[in-house]
C-alpha cells in the first residue's frame, strides 16, 4: 500500500505530516497543489517544510490556467467548485499512478463532519482528536509560522 499525503500547506495538513513522521508512519509521497495564486509566504512555508523533513514535496500544477478559469467561471463557490475540481483531478491523477494507495487528508477533529467514509482515505488528525487550535500550536512550536499569515487570517490554504 502506498501512503500519499495531500498537503494543502495549512496548519492542519502540516501538523498531520509532521505527526505522521514523528509517529514513524510510512510516508511514500507528499503532494501539494500549486494554484499559482498562493500567498508567497505559503510557497516559502512549503520550501521550509521540504527542507525540514528532508524529502521531496511533489508540486502539482493545474491542468488549466487559473486566470482563464476565473475569467470564465468567476469566483469559486460552494455551487461552482471549479477550483476544487482542478485540485482533486490533479491529485487523483497522481494517486492513481500508485494503486493501491491510501490518501491522507488533514481534516482536524473540529472538521470531522466533512469526512466522507470512502475507502482509500484516512484522516489521522480526526483519529488522534487533534483540533485546529492544537494543530496550529504544534506547528508554531516546531518553528512553522507561515510568515505571520495565521495572525491575519483563519485560513491560509
Please name every model-derived segment.
Residues 1-157:
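Nucleotide-activated chemistry modules centered on ATP-dependent adenylation/adenylyltransferase
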Amino acid at each position: 500500500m502506498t501512503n500519499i499525503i495531500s498537503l494543502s500547506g495549512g496548519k492542519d495538513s502540516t501538523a498531520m505530516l509532521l505527526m505522521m513522521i514523528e509517529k514513524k508512519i510510512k510516508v511514500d509521497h507528499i503532494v501539494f497543489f500549486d494554484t499559482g495564486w498562493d500567498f508567497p509566504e505559503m510557497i516559502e512555508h512549503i520550501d521550509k517544510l521540504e527542507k525540514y523533513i528532508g524529502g521531496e514535496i511533489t508540486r502539482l500544477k493545474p491542468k488549466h490556467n487559473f486566470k482563464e478559469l476565473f475569467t470564465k467561471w468567476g469566483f469559486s463557490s460552494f455551487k461552482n467548485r471549479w477550483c476544487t475540481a482542478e485540485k482533486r483531478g490533479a491529485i487523483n491523477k497522481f494517486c492513481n499512478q500508485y494503486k493501491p494507495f491510501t490518501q491522507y487528508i488533514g481534516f482536524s477533529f473540529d472538521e470531522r463532519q466533512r469526512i466522507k467514509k470512502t475507502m482509500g482515505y484516512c484522516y489521522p488528525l480526526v483519529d488522534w482528536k487533534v483540533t485546529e487550535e492544537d494543530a496550529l500550536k504544534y506547528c508554531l512550536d516546531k518553528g512553522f509560522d507561515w510568515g505571520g499569515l495565521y495572525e491575519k487570517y483563519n485560513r491560509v490554504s
